[in-house]
Design a protein with these regions (language model features):
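A structural detector for beta-sheet-dominated domains
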Residues: 7, 43, 54, 65-67, ...
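Short secondary-structure boundary motifs at beta->alpha junctions and helix caps
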Residues: 59-80
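Long protein-protein interaction modules used by eukaryotic assembly/scaffold proteins
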Residues: 74, 86-87
Length: 104
């Protein structure tokens, strides 16, 4: 499991701020080698939040529009990890209401 440090969280709504942190940690759980250290900052930019994810050698930024629904932060971070080749979790499929869905 990767190590995650939330260095700053500026989201003004306490419940949403806590959910953002949980979803980021959950998404990064399967990223890279088990000792990979990720540092994150969640910045409030008024109409959206910006999530900075830092790893030695690079920094990526995600924009999450407010209000962010449950799971939106997790999906955005997972998509970023997939794009960077850092997502080690195998995607599984299941049927939900007659259509294929993923665990993501």
């Amino acid at each position: 499991m990767a190590r995650v440090a939330i260095l700053r969280n500026e989201v003004p709504d306490a419940a949403m701020a806590s959910r953002f942190e949980r979803e980021i940690a959950d998404a990064l759980r399967h990223a890279g080698p088990s000792d990979t250290p990720f540092a994150c900052a969640i910045l409030d930019e008024g109409l959206h939040a910006e999530i900075e994810i830092e790893l030695p050698g690079w920094t990526e930024r995600l924009v999450i529009p407010y209000p962010a629904g449950a799971g939106e932060v997790r999906r955005a971070v997972r998509r970023l990890l997939q794009d960077l080749g850092l997502d080690d979790e195998v995607e599984t499929f299941h049927v939900v209401e007659g259509r294929a869905a993923t665990d993501r």
